[in-house]
Amino acid sequence: MFFKGKKKDKEKEKSHGNIGNVISVENKTGSQSNLHVEQNLSNEDLKIQFSQLLYELGVPEAKRVEMELWSNDKKWMLLVQNKDKIKENEEKMKQKGSLYETPQFYLSLLRENASIQKTISDLKVSLASNKLSWIDSFIGLSGFDEILKIFQTFQLKPEKNSIDFLILFDCVNIIKSILNSQSGVKSVMTTSHTFKVLVLCLDQSYPPELRNAVLQLTAALTLLPTVGHSYVLEAIENFKVSNREKVRFQTIIEGAKSVSNTQLHYEYLTSFMNLVNSIVNSPADLQVRIGLRSEFTALKLIELISNSKGVSEDLDTQINLFFECMEEDNDEVGAHYKEVNIRSPSEVSTKIDTLLQSHPALHHHFISIIKGLYTLASTQSDLGGSMWNILDESVGLILKDPSKESQLEKLQNENNNLKLQLSEIKLNNSNNNNNNNNSNNNNNDSNVSTPNINTGSPLLPPQQYQDLEQKLQLTQNEKNESQNKVKQLESEIKGLNSTLTGLQLKVTKLEADLLSVSVTTPPSDTNGTTSPPIEAPSSPSLGAPPPPPPPPPAPPVSGGGPPPPPPPPPPSSGGGPPPPPPPPSSGGPPPPPPPPGGMKKPGAPAVPNLPPKKSSVPSVKMVGLQWKKVNNNVIENSIWMNVKDYNLNDQFKQLEELFQVKKPTATTPTAPVGGASNVAVGGGSGSKSIVSTPTISILDPKRSQAIMIMLSRFKISFPDLSKAITNLDESKLNLEDAKSLLKFVPSSEEIELLKEEDPSCFGKPEQFLWELSKINRISEKLECFIFKQKLSTQIEELTPDINALLKGSMETKNNKSFHQILEIVLSLGNFINGGTPRGDIYGFKLDSLSGLLDCRSPSDSKVTLMTWLIQFLENKHPSLLEFHQEFTAIDEAKRVSIQNLRSEVASLKKGLTLLTNEVEKSEGASKTILSGFVGKSTDAVTLIEKQFNTALESFNSTVQFYGEDVKTSSPEEFFQHVSKFKNEFKRTIESIQKERENVQKLAARKKAAASGPSVPSASGSSINIAPKSGVSPITPTSKSSISISQKPPQSTQPSISVQQQQQQHHGDDDDDIPQNGTFMDQLMSKMKGGEAIRASRRASQYVFTQNGAGGVGAIDALNAALKNKK
């Protein structure tokens, strides 16, 4: 369709092979049943239809010519067999319930370029909702290649409209769904082409929504083992060349700044920081991380993000992660220089001075370098500018130059060769002098002239030898001097490496501190003292009581001493800092602003109408529950406003014992070691028009042949066809006929050309177009006919989706049992996160429910908050265990696309408008037909539009009810969160019950084997499937199990394996957890909280241990690290 090559030829050959199979098999089995079908075509029509079939099947040119020589009977048999095959396949597809269920169907539509927007949109939904076997089948049929072709084709369009951008956006989501499959990840990792195509969409000419999706996906791709990071940097370098950037990352930074005044601001910044953290913090090499970080800071990244703290929890997580990793790298650099504090310029200067005293040869070079640095600093107002970045990169290249040692070795070998050559020349020179002396003596003794015979090289004058020797000596001196210079440079590099690295880190740190003081300084309190800025995890303890509410922010303080280094000192009223701001007005303290850095002081109210949350704080450090806070400005209109704090006081002790952080010093978890088309119509020897007189052909040969093939479906004359179109005669035209005719409506240019010629000399295609040109508003008539034929089918297809959306929304909003569970989870999470920035929140987003299964007990990784919750509900609220039975429509609702529904309804309204206009302008039979239909269609379209608006309003109301963002939420995502929790809840219950049954069976076997009398059930030794009321659901004295009875047998301690939960599938819920996992969805979800980047913080943990596994084992190891991350 878009590209031609060997793959397309192979597909044609494959199609040709399939034709051969059809012929060879069905000649034997199917011919008998088809022979009774009478051939009712003329030889010309048979030839045209057979030629059309060969084109549709993609038969190669050479084979096509051969097959066109077949007998008419053989051609007819193949046509009949093909029609039977088509009907059989259609029946099979109808029995399955939909024609849109197979990857082959989507690929055929993509290659035919038929309604590309709707096809891409439907494919996106199918890939997101089907099992991974469906995705693998799509990839196996070269579906990923087709998507990339479409993506690049629309990307290369010089002028793009909103539809083009929408197709690109859907393609990004399709690529993300494909990456959930192992085969999809392999397809992406084979080349950097996918990375380059995606990154090119970060240009500011693309909509922010599309760039945001690309940022999220690219950030996840960066963490792909072995090649992800290098491919992303390669793509960004390609983007730099394409956009003519001075430095890389420049346009990406500018893109983040450009959304500052949009509703997408904080979500876009979160995705942007996700990419920055993935690029900067995942490499294993410290110098690489420092260099990449300096590139971003040189482009004023810190200034960009410092103003955005305290608004979005996800964004705060990414910003804090950036500074945490920077602090870690600073500590690591400091550990490399134990003899000197690399962060102290004075100590570094003293150390350098000592080195200079012991190495006088370095003094001149060092002074020259320092002079240059001083000049650069004094002439540049921007100390984080590009010149410093270039200098830092140059020093890094010198330090990493692998050719330095080889150059020294080469110079040494060359020096040795010169010495050897010099010795040989000296020896030859001495021998030649002796020969000259002997020759002179012989000449003196006799007057006989004897020739001078030299068996070696010709003799040279002594003066020439001396000149050569001097040149060699000079060469050797220059060589020695060069070698000394190399040694001096090497010593200089070693001495200055620590200095330059330390200075770079110092500048970065000072910039961060300066901005933290000047931009994010909190307002002064009522005593006139200023609260210290909170930057990183190294903030002061939160144990002190909170200060009184601060007054409105004062103007930024100017002047004073240098910015304080982190961590900031406590507030002080002593001298040194600038004078405090004016005291607040007497009108009473206004509500305080959000604390900087996302750190929330315990007890501080968030908005004026909300009282402060006072959750209990655990007495020990707990494993945090990763959840997302609902913004306080939407609390009042959501369910969270009426949620009460559930009393879990009697459960605190058990929760602390199960979910407290282990006391031994935690080590960084390491990942386990493991294995890492359209077929062009025309050309060739296609069918030829058989006419008795010379004909005039004014059409393109390909268009002419395509018209001939299309006309083979009509068995009426052109005038009759024209009359059928004019009168909208359904007895002679059907829906497919109208669609075909609409494609060949003559253009105005073609009509003008036809008017200049004699109609009696027209060929068949020209005659056809000439007849169509006589019909007034032929395009409008055909479109009205198509709309009339499709209306009922479209409404039948839309109604189930609209009903599912409406019903799913009402179920989710009105499920009281689900509401009570959310109330319990809120209180549970606030206790677990007590005393941390994640505690004391009013509500959480629904996708946070998946964190219940991820939060494990450090003492026993088999125990999760989900299992604890179910045990607790069994004991206290058993009726809530059946909350999922009230959800009957969400599994259907999560497959609904509002965008598709809106597009289909808009299409119906457009068709209705066209129909109404045509009724006013048409005459005769067509007016009568359309007039009778317009009333019915108006009622039907109005009704379906009303139903859609009702369902949409219900969905938006439900989304708002749970504190979610109406503008960004979609049924695919919103209902997926609820459905996922429902299914995980059911599977966990089934797993617990199965475990109890196993314990019962084991106890029964032991009881039968025992020789003594049986113990009565009243003693409490029997095992109950449901605990009695008042029995604690958790027995904390056992570290290896979850208590499932009042007194379990001492010899067996049952446990619940999370792996078993994830592998067991029941009923219709299998599609929620595909067989091979959801790698990319899980990776992108973990990246939001920083877990994925922390898990891959040192890429060597899961990449360099694979021993050439090609990255597959590395992906498994990364996936395992994400699942086991606590």
UniProtKB/Swiss-Prot annotation:
Ranges annotated as biased composition (Low complexity): 427-447, 598-607, 1009-1022, 1032-1064
Protein family according to the UniProt entry: Belongs to the formin homology family. Diaphanous subfamily.
The keyword Coiled coil appears for this protein: yes
Biased composition (Polar residues): 448-462, 518-532
Annotated DAD domain residues: 1071-1100
Gene: forB
Gene Ontology molecular function: any one: actin filament binding
Biological process, per Gene Ontology: 'de novo' actin filament nucleation; actin filament polymerization; cortical actin cytoskeleton organization; phagocytosis, engulfment
Protein's UniProt name: Formin-B
Role according to the record: Formins play an important role in the nucleation of actin and the formation of linear actin filaments.
Keywords of this entry: Actin-binding, Coiled coil
Keyword set includes Coiled coil: yes
Residues in FH2 domain copies: 612-1011
FH1 domain: residues covered: 527-611
Residue ranges annotated for the GBD/FH3 domain, each copy included: 38-406
